[in-house]
Amino acid sequence: MPATAPIDAVMQALAVPTRRAVFERIVRSGEITVVELTRGSGVTQGAISQHLKSLKLAGLVVERPEGRNAYYRARPEGLEPLADWMGHYGAFWRDRFADLRTLLKEIDP
């Protein structure tokens, strides 16, 4: 089986709405346990664990075991492949906004 490119792994991990919500909650919390993630989520602990596994494999979170608990925190550098990919389109958007600015000035000098 061919290795997944980092951008593919990140996009696949964040493509699932529940997984995105888990990731966002980790980001907001700084560091959080599976039990805390499960509480109030409407998702089983087993499902949360599977989502965490996908996020870890994509390099988006890291796990820190402490006693009987495992604490999860986001890895901001895990989003770099996505940011790099999006950066390639920055010129496209800058050009489009420049064209829009020109058009607006022509319409309403």
Each language-model region and where it sits:
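Generic C-terminal helix-cap and adjacent flexible tail
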Residues: 105-109
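Beta-hairpin "wing" of winged helix-turn-helix
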Residues: 56-67, 73
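Alpha-helical residues within the helix-turn-helix
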Residues: 39, 50, 56-57
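Conserved H-loop
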Residues: 47
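C-terminal structural segments of small proteins and small subunits
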Residues: 79-103
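Histidine-centered divalent metal-coordination motifs
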Residues: 19, 50-51
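N-terminal helix-turn-helix DNA-binding core of bacterial DNA-binding proteins
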Residues: 2-44, 69-80, 84
